[in-house]
Amino acid sequence: MGSKRRRATSPSSSVSGDFDDGHHSVSTPGPSRKRRRLSNLPTVDPIAVCHELYNTIRDYKDEQGRLLCELFIRAPKRRNQPDYYEVVSQPIDLMKIQQKLKMEEYDDVNLLTADFQLLFNNAKSYYKPDSPEYKAACKLWDLYLRTRNEFVQKGEADDEDDDEDGQDNQGTVTEGSSPAYLKEILEQLLEAIVVATNPSGRLISELFQKLPSKVQYPDYYAIIKEPIDLKTIAQRIQNGSYKSIHAMAKDIDLLAKNAKTYNEPGSQVFKDANSIKKIFYMKKAEIEHHEMAKSSLRMRTPSNLAAARLTGPSHSKGSLGEERNPTSKYYRNKRAVQGGRLSAITMALQYGSESEEDAALAAARYEEGESEAESITSFMDVSNPFYQLYDTVRSCRNNQGQLIAEPFYHLPSKKKYPDYYQQIKMPISLQQIRTKLKNQEYETLDHLECDLNLMFENAKRYNVPNSAIYKRVLKLQQVMQAKKKELARRDDIEDGDSMISSATSDTGSAKRKSKKNIRKQRMKILFNVVLEAREPGSGRRLCDLFMVKPSKKDYPDYYKIILEPMDLKIIEHNIRNDKYAGEEGMIEDMKLMFRNARHYNEEGSQVYNDAHILEKLLKEKRKELGPLPDDDDMASPKLKLSRKSGISPKKSKYMTPMQQKLNEVYEAVKNYTDKRGRRLSAIFLRLPSRSELPDYYLTIKKPMDMEKIRSHMMANKYQDIDSMVEDFVMMFNNACTYNEPESLIYKDALVLHKVLLETRRDLEGDEDSHVPNVTLLIQELIHNLFVSVMSHQDDEGRCYSDSLAEIPAVDPNFPNKPPLTFDIIRKNVENNRYRRLDLFQEHMFEVLERARRMNRTDSEIYEDAVELQQFFIKIRDELCKNGEILLSPALSYTTKHLHNDVEKERKEKLPKEIEEDKLKREEEKREAEKSEDSSGAAGLSGLHRTYSQDCSFKNSMYHVGDYVYVEPAEANLQPHIVCIERLWEDSAGEKWLYGCWFYRPNETFHLATRKFLEKEVFKSDYYNKVPVSKILGKCVVMFVKEYFKLCPENFRDEDVFVCESRYSAKTKSFKKIKLWTMPISSVRFVPRDVPLPVVRVASVFANADKGDDEKNTDNSEDSRAEDNFNLEKEKEDVPVEMSNGEPGCHYFEQLHYNDMWLKVGDCVFIKSHGLVRPRVGRIEKVWVRDGAAYFYGPIFIHPEETEHEPTKMFYKKEVFLSNLEETCPMTCILGKCAVLSFKDFLSCRPTEIPENDILLCESRYNESDKQMKKFKGLKRFSLSAKVVDDEIYYFRKPIVPQKEPSPLLEKKIQLLEAKFAELEGGDDDIEEMGEEDSEVIEPPSLPQLQTPLASELDLMPYTPPQSTPKSAKGSAKKEGSKRKINMSGYILFSSEMRAVIKAQHPDYSFGELSRLVGTEWRNLETAKKAEYEERAAKVAEQQERERAAQQQQPSASPRAGTPVGALMGVVPPPTPMGMLNQQLTPVAGMMGGYPPGLPPLQGPVDGLVSMGSMQPLHPGGPPPHHLPPGVPGLPGIPPPGVMNQGVAPMVGTPAPGGSPYGQQVGVLGPPGQQAPPPYPGPHPAGPPVIQQPTTPMFVAPPPKTQRLLHSEAYLKYIEGLSAESNSISKWDQTLAARRRDVHLSKEQESRLPSHWLKSKGAHTTMADALWRLRDLMLRDTLNIRQAYNLENV
């Protein structure tokens, strides 16, 4: 019998599914023994047990599926059940227990047990034994005790048994088994842990591979006494420390225990620890089962028995498949490959990375993949080269994360593109290639490459070269070729690098760094600067107080002051999980953290100073790192070859950052719920069909629902967030258009619209690429504020704004005011008419204050108005962040002001209301006396009444407190509802009842817009008596607080009503009932199975008014054109007294002029004649004189109005404060603008000024010295309260202003071009024509120059060149520009005067000197200027004569630098004998020594040699000699006997003629040294060529001569011999050598036997080609040995 089954170590195994340890029994096939092995498990974590016990109680359901814990989630409220607190002295509920669990207040299970016992004892003491609460408490307490006992019993292990068990296990493992076999099994177990991923593709073992950093987590080592990680376990595997699987299992248990002890239950690390244990034991059990199954099929040899006890894996499978599968060469030697992979895993874990910080902050990366690519892994291993090449092409993405190969997934449609199949004879797509891969139709990689190339060539043949698909093809071909080369370099049987070894190896890591990795590395460096900063004297870490946020218990005010808390833990987590799109995001969070510290703490405190120091260090380090390098500065991007997931073949679904944002917006709208947990988006998920709701599709022209939005998102149809938001807005607008404004759907649409806007704002807050649209932000804020106020509800779900719908639009006290209601405000908000928050607040407060004025203080409307006004102020302050986001005059009215106004109003109203109540009571008393008198006079029957508590009628008993239906006065009406308060029988024997009457909504007077609860009635002020004979039946009226939770027994739903308010027939008003005072009923109430939802319905009068609304639709459409105007705040002219004012002038602080309100401090555009842009003036004084208005203030000028260097840069929209202060009439004002300081320009905007009219000013321009100097700021004015201040919106993140070049730069360029126009006029046409031709066919810069045959020389015509290379043209133009200067009088004057001024002002810059020279020239007399012009003309004539002589000189005697005297030096590829110096003789058809088609060069160029004078060749001349053909089989080597004639013998040896260097290729040798003809015989001699040997401009140093002494080689051979060695060479080292481990110098590469190969082929270098040859030779050797069974050779 195996060991007893029990729970796993972690108590969370009940949730996470940890395996129990019963599998130990399989490894002991001896006789059965009842042995307890509980001590093998680590100690149970008490915190985890507490969480498990709580979860068990919380999740328990009864037979009906109801959660029993719902009865104990919250203790009864003292207001509802005060008697509960008389019985229970220590109330407690599950919410308090959960809170204590979160705060880790339970150190022991006994503490949790005590609280649960208190909870259930309280329930038993208060509730009756037959109540559901009592029964649930008993059940849950029994469940708790059982579960606790199961967990606590795990500590009953015996240490002695554990030791014996361990010895037994070791004995069974080591007996008959080798250490290598054990090591292989342990590596398999480790591999299962390392490669395990969660469903999203994240590596579970990532944080367990290395221990946490002692710098970042010092408390970890204080809590954990025995730290261990996977690296340590890997080292122990390699060192052979484990003698059994049981020993490794102990370390895995310790690893999981440490993680669960340090981390909170429920955290990701806690769950990962459980998963690692689960994976380990799953793999262990799988190995056991697999080995036992195999052993049962084979003979039980001793070795097999030992293997069974060891539970080792089988490696024999697949051998038969190799013989049958043609592609089996990629799967041969699977055991060896697997062993190599496992060893790579353990070795990678053993050595790890050199940087602990890199490992601590490393996040798992997975290659992007789609569902189709994931499906391939089901039939093909990801290490297969076929799969890697296919997936590289298929998964390649561009910079935006889009799949480049997406158009190639499927073939084009034959219907849409019939011509495609006419042009393309062999169409193919990735889908077909995938099918071939699945069917294993590819024998080699070349076959797969051919199909991919066929697909690409098809696309190139069908599409235009400049099309997007054509460019994609080029990119994919480049990627495919690079991947193919890499796969060819690797050994086919090698599985590739493991994830960790490749991620942590230093070799080649710099080449694989992408821009993303560099960005992350920079963030880690900046983070470590803050983390490791210490105080110089004491060594205190400055970041200690910034690691975690302050405790809410100790610092509750912190979270009221700081609205966005931030700490280093959050920043570190964001870096790890790649939450930052760039470095700026992390810097912003750092700055936010430091800003919070300075905002909360006093200036001068330690935290304040630390924040300042750390921020300074961060800025300095960032400045030191410099800007992030561009893509071009980094190495070429490598293909993603799963380097970081080499041992994790599965790929995760990749989402681009944009897709993640879109998904976040969608999920935020979809998952939003209200306070009651109702998901608002349910109604918007799918539209009703046309058959269900045909009128909807008649009204809505563009239907939209969330399913359609989701399908668009999945199809990648949204390119940005705004396009998705547009569809959401359309959907919500459709809902608001079709549904009534007071309907539930309408309000849900508004709320979800608000959620949508908030989510988009949060997501786009990280982008600083553009200036936010302040107008839209203000309108969005006002919209959110309005929706929040109108949706504000009480505890029962009633909207406070419902009662205010009855407020009249016009105040009777102010009949002249325009009407204003919430409906009018809503239309203004929807039409974006509000541009100021204070105006919107005025309108809202006007409606609410009117409601307060027109209603009593104890009325429901009054109380709702006060509540909405308080809520408005609260939400307004939250949205504006108390002025941090929006600074508005509206913020000056606070809750304190509201309370004062309400108290003052109540003091004024209360005496009047008391008097009204007194008069009302007297009137009611008089009416009651009258009714009693009339009833007494009617008869004496009332004097003989017999009262009772109940009576019977028609076999029914009626009690006092019952609700009954009473026969209506008219037959068509519904029966009345009466609550019986008295029952009696008169002397005549007739039974009567007296009670309060309840009215239905249609029996009250109310507005059609009012909404009511379903089945709602109202308690009236009408009481009367009715004969019992008129009773029609029973019903029940319940108070609103009980109606939704309880239901009466034995009553139908239609006979149950709800009452929330009382109705006064005299005042025709409703008032909410606070205390239910009706008589106690005999009806028994029970809890509802499911609480009723709070649903309000429209009034029955609403349908009647709907027709009137439809009649007014046409009028509203006509008036919609008038709805686009903006509402303006009421302002007034504000005069001001000026002590030093001029007589007759009336001064103002604020003035209305020409439909524009202007105040002191405003900036305006003023008319400026002759300027490109109007100047800007600032109003510092405003006055009116004789009916004309004027203002006075400084003038701002634009950059083009200042004198400055053309190279100076300016901010966009920058202006400068000038020295001018002018008085201007108001008639010259063109419009308002705003001039902001640099700091304000980055951070805020006035809300009423368009962005185009926002200007930046940080400098003052001094006209006298032409200097720009920064100044502190503009003058500020203190204005009266009547002046309306501007509202200022502050950005969440400062913007980055862009600079632009000076406007004078273009003018300066045009001026210079005009000066040189005359000089370059003649040559420009030729050069431009040559440049146009060169753009069509651009010759190669260094073409291969080949020696023509004799027959070809005779046929080569003379073709003069038609184009000039750009490099040559540029050099010629540069040279010519130095010679050709258009001399003018000013240039001559400047050359003479500049030296004089320079001597007078030695400290002046070049620009300042030029400005002074220009001033002197302008001040020069006319006669002097004419004299300079005359002298300049003579100089120009002399230069022209010299230029003409130079142009004629080449025809007679060529000189260096001319086309005739320059030859192109072409360097051929290296030959086995070294670089041969060949001689090239000019031939017919050459232009100055160039073959046809090669352009001449102007001037010396690198690689060219300028020759001396040389006679030109004539087309009719004799054919020159050419080089003899090379020796057969050795291209490029001349025959013997030719070396001493036309070719230098060797590089570095003296050439004939005494020159110490050999002639360069293509350079003519000395006279008389010409090559002989290839065959004997006479030939016509050409004219002699006169040459002047010149020194080459560039001579490469000769290569170093390498000698190999035979004696040295023999000595090395003798030293290598050893008696212990079976071979002469170190063949094992040679066999293990790899290309990436061997680095060759250039000298070593030059000595490689490159002559073995014709060329390097598709390889990058010749060394790579030789490595490939070596691999092929080794493989062939192995194949020959295996094919012929050469085991003993």
Swiss-Prot record:
Phosphoserine PTM positions: 10, 39, 131, 178, 316, 319, 353, 355, 371, 375, 498, 509, 636, 648, 689, 948, 987, 1119, 1405, 1453
Any Pfam family matching the protein: Bromodomain
Mutation effect (residue 523 to I): Found in a case of clear cell renal carcinoma; somatic mutation
UniProt cross-link Glycyl lysine isopeptide (Lys-Gly) (interchain with G-Cter in SUMO2), position: 96, 154, 210, 425, 471, 511, 591, 638, 653, 1106, 1111, 1167, 1293, 1308, 1398, 1642, 1654, 1656
Keyword Phosphoprotein among record annotations: yes
UniProt-reported outcome of changing residue 1287 to Q: Found in a breast cancer cell line
Recorded consequence of changing residue 1647 to C: Found in a breast cancer cell line
SUPFAM superfamilies: Bromodomain, HMG-box
DNA-binding region: 1379-1447
Effect annotated for changing residue 661 to N: Found in a case of clear cell renal carcinoma; somatic mutation
Biased composition (Acidic residues): 157-167
Effect upon mutating residue 202 to C: Found in a endometrial cancer cell line
Effect on the protein of changing residue 1120 to Q: Found in hematopoietic and lymphoid cancer cell lines
Record note on what altering residue 1614 to N does: Found in a case of clear cell renal carcinoma; somatic mutation
Tissue: Widely expressed.
Function as written in the Swiss-Prot or TrEMBL entry: Involved in transcriptional activation and repression of select genes by chromatin remodeling (alteration of DNA-nucleosome topology). Required for the stability of the SWI/SNF chromatin remodeling complex SWI/SNF-B (PBAF). Acts as a negative regulator of cell proliferation.
Name of the protein: Protein polybromo-1
Taxonomic source organism: Homo sapiens
